[in-house]
Amino acid sequence: MEPLPEPASGPRPRPHRLLLLSLLLLLLPLLPAPELGPRQARAEDTDWVRLPSKCEVCKYVAVELKSAFEETGKTKEVIDTGYGILDRKASGVKYTKSDLRLIEVTETICKRLLDYSLHKERTGSNRFAKGMSETFETLHNLVHKGVKVVMDIPYELWNETSAEVADLKKQCDVLVEEFEEVIEDWYRNHQEEDLTQFLCANHVLKGKDASCLAEQWSGKKGDTAALGGKKSKKKSGRAKGLGGGSSKQRKELGDLDGDPSPEEDEGIQKASPLTHSPPDEL
C-alpha cells in the first residue's frame, strides 16, 4: 500500500502575531464598559426612582386646589376696594369672589404638595399621599422598640422629601404657570364643574393618558395616609379615670402605652446608630 499523502500545512502564524493576540486577550477585561444610552439608563432608574407623570401631577394639583378653595371659602370677609368714597356708597367685594383669593391660592398651592410622601407599597398614582408610608411606619415602630435598624439611608434622612415628591412640586410650578388662565376661567365662570375634569381631562391631559384620574385609594384600617396624616387616638380607660390628670401622669401613661415621644424616639435611635451596609442586611 502506498502511504497516504500528508496534508498540506498552511503558513504558520508568525511569532509577533501570536504575541499581539495574547496582549489583546489580556487587555480585554480592562477595557471600559460601553456607556448606557438614555433609554437604557432610564430603564434602570425606574427600578428605584420613578418620577411623577403629568397625569399624576395634574391630579394632585386639582386635589389641593379643591381643598384650598374649600378652606378659603368659609369666610364672610368683605374686601374694601377703596372706591365709592366720594359718592358715600358702600364699596367692597366678597373675599370668596375676589382676585385676592385666587392669587393667594395659586401662589401657595404647589408648596402643599411637599406635605406628601412616597408610598412605594402602593400602585399607580396612589403612591403619592399625605402621611408616613407603611414601610417607614414599620421601621419607626422597630426603632421605638429599641431594635437596631440597618439601612443605607441615615436615620436623619428618613423623613426628608423624596426625589419623586420634589419633582411633583417642581412640575406643579410649571403646570400652574402654563394653565393659569384655565384655572382663572374655572374660578370665575365654571365653579359648578368638577375641577379635576375641567383642568386635567379637558385641558392639561386632553388627548393624552388620563387613566390615573380614575384611580382611588380606599385605605386600610389604621392607615394614617388615607386620613391625610391624621390619626385619631382614643383615651385609655385609665386616662378617662384620671380625668385628664397632670402632665406627669399623662407622660407616665404614655410610657405605659408604649408610645414614646419624638425626643425619646431620637434618643433610642442614637443609642442604636445606623450603619451603612448592603440592603440585604435589613
UniProtKB/Swiss-Prot annotation:
Disulfide-bond pairs as recorded: C55-C212, C58-C200, C110-C172
Domain of life of the native organism: Eukaryota
Acidic residues bias: start-end ranges: 255-266
Signal sequence residues: 1-33
PANTHER family to which the protein is assigned, alphabetical: CTG4A-RELATED, PROTEIN CANOPY HOMOLOG 3
Subunit structure: Interacts with HSP90B1; this interaction is disrupted in the presence of ATP. Interacts with TLR1, TLR2, TLR4 and TLR9.
Name of the protein: Protein canopy homolog 3
Provenance organism: Bos taurus
